[in-house]
């Protein structure tokens, strides 16, 4: 039975209420946020410009869109910022209004919600445990002329796996030939060093929509900032007109402008994930009764080999919150997602997992 009402991670208020403690007493591994925290440059800019909240934001977000355009080396007219990438998901779904769409499971729940709101027929393509939850070329056969849209999360959430570029290109080519809009959710791609995603390929592929997030990499989930990118200026302009005015607050827009210039922060994050991610993965693999999938983002998918062990409940008693994946289509109560955090925080989770799993054998 689910512990919480929320369908997402990061629900520390409800988890803390279950324990009868303050939320700041809980160590949260359920939300995939950069543990280095907000860049100092962003924090300083917000503090120095607090008076901007006394004015309406620029309705066109000119400076933010220019900063994003410089960052990706594309025209600003290709970009539409939103109140977190989740808004961009709903914006592109309502703007394209597909009649039939495929979403890959397990995957982010908001694709289905956004499509359901517009009455779209949803077909689910299930990743297989036998394939290590990796996307294979079998999906190409599911791309048929009656489809309007395909949602892909690259890297996938919750598996953290990134499909091979050759396969993604084959999918993009088939979608183009069949006039299918390909929506690529690249919310976590910034965590993968030197991985540019599909934005550089958009010029000749107006059927591809790339969704990005600044929330996770720059640790600003409370501000909310995401954006979509597409090379069809007219289509983006149409969505811009349909978007709610002032959907991005002034502080979030400023944070985005400043964060994108902080290359030192990017390098520091890559260094942390390269070192700590590998160490944490290896340490988890040494624990009994756990299967750990080698994701490339800042989180890992785990499977507990004992269905009667509720790791989320057990760890919560030690004031640690992890993400149960039982509500992901295609997964069940054996699966969990954990963020990769600082070395000290990861050690605390490892110690708690040892306490739960050590001494328990499959024969018990």
Swiss-Prot record:
Transmembrane segments: none
CDD domains tied to this protein: AAT_like
Biological role stated in the UniProt entry: Decarboxylates L-threonine-O-3-phosphate to yield (R)-1-amino-2-propanol O-2-phosphate, the precursor for the linkage between the nucleotide loop and the corrin ring in cobalamin.
Organism: Salmonella typhi
Enzymatic class: lyase
PROSITE patterns: AA_TRANSFER_CLASS_1 (PS00105)
Subunit (UniProt): Homodimer.
NCBIfam families hit by this protein: L_thr_O3P_dcar (TIGR01140)
Gene Ontology molecular function: any one: threonine-phosphate decarboxylase activity
EC number: 4.1.1.81
One of the GO BP terms on file: cobalamin biosynthetic process
Protein name: Threonine-phosphate decarboxylase
InterPro entries (alphabetical): Aminotransferase_I/II_large (IPR004839), CobD (IPR005860), NHTrfase_class1_PyrdxlP-BS (IPR004838), PyrdxlP-dep_Trfase (IPR015424), PyrdxlP-dep_Trfase_major (IPR015421), PyrdxlP-dep_Trfase_small (IPR015422)
Reaction(s) catalysed (UniProt annotation): O-phospho-L-threonine + H(+) = (R)-1-aminopropan-2-yl phosphate + CO2
Cofactors that this protein relies on: pyridoxal 5'-phosphate
Positions of post-translational N6-(pyridoxal phosphate)lysine modification: 216
Native organism taxonomy: Bacteria, Pseudomonadati, Pseudomonadota, Gammaproteobacteria, Enterobacterales
Keywords recorded for this protein, A-Z: Cobalamin biosynthesis, Lyase, Pyridoxal phosphate
One family name in Pfam for this protein: Aminotran_1_2
